[in-house]
């Protein structure tokens, strides 16, 4: 028996809604048809955020509580009036992506299970020059909402100082987004460079509230994710619905609303009435086009002062001028910080290597090494054999890998039960949950920073629980082909993140 459908006529075009009664938000009781009707109620504002922009389809086909999959290639059975644009990804591959231009297109993608819409910051007519700089305020765990709002106001000041206008909106999740309309005459790397300069300027203005540090283990407060402006990165657009139990919405705000705004106030149920009564707070964005020249001058001053590039996302080829792409907890420490006798690769410093080798051969195992603390001068004995291992400056261990966030959090709960004394010392920011990028879907890992745990209580690295392998369903031939493609583009390994390359 065929699944029931509801046919909607939107701007003279028929859009079929399959399984209209399917529950998408179990706790709130909202159905797929409710989702489609919501988007139609805010269509002018929602289309403004995506019009003319290619987008990947993030599909929650079994509702908000299911794991989404990302479909970059436009479905073959799309309606003839749905536009596409051909994008080239960092991997070198291409795909025809959907371009939504009107309310009918909005309803059509909603029927596919797209709760949040993820357009690129470029228009289909010019895929190499973004016309939008995106500021993503991403709080570390435990940061209060009030602090995120405070940082947003600092961003406004920083933008104004370089002649730019920001358009804020709640992310619908934990943060705030601020979009900046710019002239489409800069490349992706140049826009990212400007975003990094902005992040650093905000950090200078509010050093206790904000950070531009890429590595999670170094962050505090609210992170300004400058890498959201790298090519192929996207953020949820205005009026997107997020996969949370209350069907929260990414809602545009006026600047005078930001200091008192509460993210939970904006949901699938409440936003249509708010929108009907006050309109779209972001409606003027296309009339506020700005230049990046002044912000790029800030970047040039930073670089002249020795503040160069910052790390790129792991799936990008190594960039000119980029610092080593190594987590601080895994970085090799300067020679002066090594323990006595721990030279490069586990040997002594090169200038005494030959002397020490000769002395050891002559029967003195401690030749060339300083006395061990607490032992009398001239003591002869044996020292532990150097292992060549680095001593991490930040003690981070990995707890779990899984296909869903819920599974890694459950694994972390089991770890806490095994190590209650260590768990008692953890702060919210010490628990690092990362959305990783698989070949065709997202997966998750959870790590713990033990910096606040006394050394005597720090557990060692254990087997992961659970230990998910994102490649388990991939044939050896497919994996080899994928790795070869990454190696050809800068020696990269498969580096999962939250969205696939192809």
Predicted regions, residues:
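Signature for HUH/AEP ssDNA processing cores
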Residues: 98-171, 182-190, 348, 354, ...
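C-terminal accessory nucleic-acid interaction domains of nucleic acid-metabolism proteins
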Residues: 1-29, 36, 47, 51-52, ...
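Acidic/polar low-complexity segments and flexible, solvent-exposed patches
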Residues: 338-502
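Short beta-strand
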Residues: 58-60, 166-172, 212-216
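A contiguous, low-structure linker/loop signature
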Residues: 66-120
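Short secondary-structure junctions
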Residues: 48-50, 159-165, 206, 420-426
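A short linear hydrophobic-aromatic micro-motif
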Residues: 163-168, 209-211, 427-432
């Amino acid at each position: 028996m065929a699944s029931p459908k509801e046919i909607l006529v939107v701007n003279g075009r028929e859009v079929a809604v399959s399984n209209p009664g399917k529950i998408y938000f179990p706790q709130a009781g909202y159905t797929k048809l409710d989702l489609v009707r919501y988007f139609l109620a805010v269509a002018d504002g929602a289309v403004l955020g995506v019009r003319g922009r290619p987008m990947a389809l993030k599909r929650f086909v079994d509702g908000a509580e299911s794991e989404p999959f990302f479909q970059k290639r436009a479905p073959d059975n799309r309606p003839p009036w749905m536009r596409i644009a051909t994008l080239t990804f960092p991997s070198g591959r291409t795909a025809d992506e959907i371009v939504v231009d009107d309310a009918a297109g909005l309803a059509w993608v909603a029927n596919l299970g797209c709760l949040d819409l993820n357009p690129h910051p470029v228009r289909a007519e010019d895929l190499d020059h973004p016309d939008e700089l995106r500021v993503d305020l991403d709080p570390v765990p435990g940061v209060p909402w009030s602090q995120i709002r405070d940082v947003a106001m600092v961003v406004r000041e920083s933008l104004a100082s370089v002649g730019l206008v920001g358009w804020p909106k709640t992310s619908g999740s934990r943060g705030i987004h601020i979009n900046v309309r710019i002239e489409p005459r800069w490349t992706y790397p140049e826009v990212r460079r400007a975003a990094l300069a902005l992040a650093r300027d905000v950090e200078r203005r509010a050093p206790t509230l904000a950070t531009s540090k890429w590595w999670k283990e170094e962050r505090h407060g609210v992170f300004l994710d400058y890498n959201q402006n790298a090519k192929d990165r996207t953020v949820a657009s205005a009026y997107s619905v997020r996969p949370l139990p209350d069907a929260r919405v990414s809602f545009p705000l006026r600047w005078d609303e930001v200091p008192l705004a509460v993210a939970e106030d904006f949901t699938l149920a409440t936003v249509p009435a708010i929108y009907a009564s006050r309109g779209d707070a972001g409606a003027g964005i296309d009339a506020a086009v700005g230049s990046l020249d002044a912000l790029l001058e800030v970047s040039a001053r930073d670089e002249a002062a020795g503040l160069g590039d910052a790390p790129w996302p792991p799936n990008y080829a190594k960039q000119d001028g980029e610092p080593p792409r190594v987590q601080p907890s895994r970085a090799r420490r300067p020679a002066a910080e090594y323990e006595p006798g721990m030279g490069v690769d586990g040997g002594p410093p090169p200038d005494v290597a030959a002397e020490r080798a000769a002395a050891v051969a002559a029967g003195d195992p401690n030749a060339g090494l300083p006395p061990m603390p607490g032992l009398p001068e001239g003591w002869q004995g044996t020292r532990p054999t150097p292992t060549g291992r680095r001593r991490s400056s930040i003690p981070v261990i990995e707890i779990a890998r899984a296909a869903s966030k819920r599974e890694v959090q459950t694994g972390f709960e089991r770890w806490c039960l095994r190590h209650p004394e260590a768990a008692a010392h953890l702060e919210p920011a010490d628990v690092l949950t990362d959305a990783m990028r698989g070949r065709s879907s997202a997966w998750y890992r959870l790590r713990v920073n033990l910096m606040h745990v006394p050394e005597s209580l720090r557990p060692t690295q254990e087997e992961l629980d659970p230990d998910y392998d994102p490649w388990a369903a991939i044939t050896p031939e497919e994996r080899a082909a994928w790795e070869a493609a990454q190696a050809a583009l800068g020696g990269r390994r498969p580096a999962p993140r939250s969205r696939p390359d192809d």
